[in-house]
């Protein structure tokens, strides 16, 4: 089976996405990376209606992207087109594309109505990264309700670029860790109360890193009375930072309904003990209480953090059990090769 994997990334991200997608190829499944980022700024098709406007106007950049994709599919004799990240392919274009089409969702309900659900009819298969959706429906139930033809759970994973493959398990366990608690992620207003509560409880022992504008930083400091300025991290600095951390907090934008981010794998993949939201859905990724710990609110999170900081042996055991699970089941090469089992039966009957 040959898959053209369409994604949009730039710089350091593009390099490792392209490299690691291609490297997952073996005798049974081959991957052809296709980066659709350079043709158009993603802001021009971030929402489905914006893409429809571009398609109606026959935007030259869009047409060049489509022509190049068609040529790659034909030259490679691809069986599958898999589309990830921001989806740039209009349903009327896909309708005439003679290949099995799979849509990969990676943001869940936070962006589903903008760039997922509008395209379901144009794809033969939907691969969703999390089983959660809302208090009313799970993601498979929602996809079924929306008329998706086929759908399967296909989680995100740990890229090799985001951990040090040279380190053995004993070496990861022995890393000197001088940061007690870390959070890495965007400083969304919905996350601020939780982060502020942890910061007030642990002070300098808790470090926050990630994406935050000047306005959000100012609001965060003024609203919660914190001397905390959140700064971004260069991609190449993620691993050294993770290797210094004892415990990592994972907080998703809609709590358990958006569980399944890349951070869910990056933290344990670097030997960081992870405490995450996710509720009843977390066991689709890890064994709760053994490979990961969970929390429901700020008070419970602070209690769990204090528990592990005062019990270093338990923290170390949680961290290394999580590390073993990631190395066994959640690396990107393993995840990509799972597509053969997920897609082959459907492609054969296409």
Predicted regions and their residues:
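Nucleotide-sugar donor-binding catalytic core of glycosyltransferases
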Residues: 1-68, 76, 84-93, 106-283, ...
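Short amphipathic alpha-helix with an adjacent loop that forms part of the alpha/beta core around
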Residues: 71-74, 308
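Short beta-strand/loop segments at the ligand-binding rim of alpha/beta enzyme cores
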Residues: 97-105
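Conserved acidic donor-binding segment of nucleotide-sugar-dependent glycosyltransferases
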Residues: 261, 292-298, 307-313
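A charged, aromatic-enriched C-terminal amphipathic alpha-helix characteristic of glycosyltransferases
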Residues: 309-343
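Generic C-terminal helix-cap and adjacent flexible tail
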Residues: 343-350
